[in-house]
Amino acid sequence: MSSIIFIPNDADNINSIMVTISSSLSLVGCLFILSIYIYYKELREFQLKLIFIMTINDFIISIIFLIATHIQTKYFDAITNVFPFFCNFPDSLLHYFFLSSFFWEVCIAHTLIQVIKYNNDKVEDNLKKYFIFSNGLSALIMVSLFFIRSYSKIDCHHDSIFPHLLFFIPLLLTWIYNIIVCALLTKTFKEQAMNFGYSLGINGGSGSYINFTNNNSIDNYSNIIIKNDLIINNNNNINVNNNNNNINILFHVNVNNNNNKIIIKRIRKTPNIIWTSIFFLFSFGFIWSWSILVIILKYLSLDVKYILMISYFFIPLHGCMNAVCFGVNDRLRMNLKKSCKNYYYKFLGLFSLDKRKSYGINGNNKNNKNNNGANCEERSLIDYSPDDDDDEDDDNNNNNYSDGNYYQIPSPFLIDSRNSSNLTDYSVILDNNNNNNNNGPYNPTRSNSITELLYNNINSLNAIRILSNNNNNNNNNNNNNNNNNNNNNNINNNDNNNNNNNNNSFCTIDEDETK
């Protein structure tokens, strides 16, 4: 019998099945996070690196559960006979790796509070300290447990209090520390929202709008971070300096033409990192509360059969819970969605001309070269060129796609800015990330600071499309005006031709009269 009950007995078939199901779910979740970290190089940041290391611990835990559940305990008795302080070798391994996983969760929470509350941009220097804290402290606890068992002659019965204290005390401290971090993060975001209101001159920091009149310049607020909706009026009198690179827009941008002012609308929205912390706290407490309840009922000599069965199912789900809470975020979903679109378009044969027409790419229109900006909203985000077999058909249709490879088009914002002349007034605001980063074109998934990265709510593509619609409407109006002017010119030309014909008829000389 193990002092910490992780693995059911050989005769417990139902409990073994439940452990197998839950540990398999955790194994799938861990493999998903590990694969994502290896495949997407742009996501290999410090925060995900910590999650990657914690996921390795959870992966090992899932493997131990699966192996120990389907192998009889007599095969581990040889190790127990040589090292009696192990009591049960698989349970001792699980004890160590669970402690290591708890401490890595503490390190992740510490990183969040350092970045968000204290604006510490050197948290990557703490990686070695995190390794020593997580793995070293876990090993120290296990060594102390083995020392107590060896020299105090304590048996391996489940009623022994020392293993329980050395496991559940770190567990409870981890949960309490994450509660404190969640409370501090919530308080910090509220303070930042209030300070944002005061910096813009909003009374009490709780107002909804700030107006920039014609005499004001947005450069006066060049160091703020806009975490709300920004409504920019299309007014050329407002001064937006191209050197303003420090305004960061994290949500939408809308365009109005009501008055001569810029309106910043403040929307109160709880950041996703807060919801992630809350979800982690509830799931962590729910998973381990059953195990704590089993220990309490055992000390009270009460029946724990059904509660122990629930505990066997939920304890191996610890890795799956970590994968869902920490691994699945907005940036990951955005990259997965983009990859799915790429493979979907590639393998369903969207290289042909007819399929491209269905996505708004018209190859028969000769004026398509000059109307790329007007058709930007109708395009798919990823354009593909035809394969080698379709080259002749595309040449006959005057199509611009003649390569044999597919490629990703530039950012939609760059297309809009090149083909829309009225976008220059706001390009400095929307393109601030591009100006601050010299590694390539604008990327909605890229963040200029670790603090901004934690929001994971960049929705600037919708803003760009709104601006594109406004500019496209202006271009359409200009085209209509030009067409009207051309029609008027044609009418005038027809009138002139009629007048000339009349003049010619009056100037004709009859030959009979001359004779």
Swiss-Prot record:
Compositional bias segments (type: Acidic residues): 385-396
Q: Does the keyword Endoplasmic reticulum apply?
A: no
Q: Per UniProt, which keywords does this protein have?
A: G-protein coupled receptor, Membrane, Receptor, Transducer, Transmembrane, Transmembrane helix
Pfam families in the record: 7tm_2
* Any GO CC annotation of this UniProt entry: plasma membrane
Transmembrane intervals: 17-37, 51-71, 93-113, 130-150, 165-185, 277-297, 307-327
Q: Where in the cell is it found?
A: Membrane
UniProt xrefs under Gene3D superfamilies: Rhodopsin 7-helix transmembrane proteins (1.20.1070.10)
- Which stretches does UniProt call biased (Low complexity)? 362-375, 397-407, 469-504
InterPro entries, A to Z: GCR1-cAMP_receptor, GPCR_2-like_7TM, GPCR_2_secretin-like, GPCR_GCR1_put
GO BP, one annotated term: adenylate cyclase-activating G protein-coupled receptor signaling pathway
What broad class describes the main subcellular location of this protein? Answer: membrane
Molecular function in Gene Ontology:
G protein-coupled receptor activity
Role description:
Receptor for cAMP.
Q: Which family does it belong to?
A: Belongs to the G-protein coupled receptor 5 family.
User: What is the protein's name according to its record?
Assistant: Cyclic AMP receptor-like protein G
Q: Which species does this protein come from?
A: Dictyostelium discoideum
Gene symbol of the encoding locus: crlG
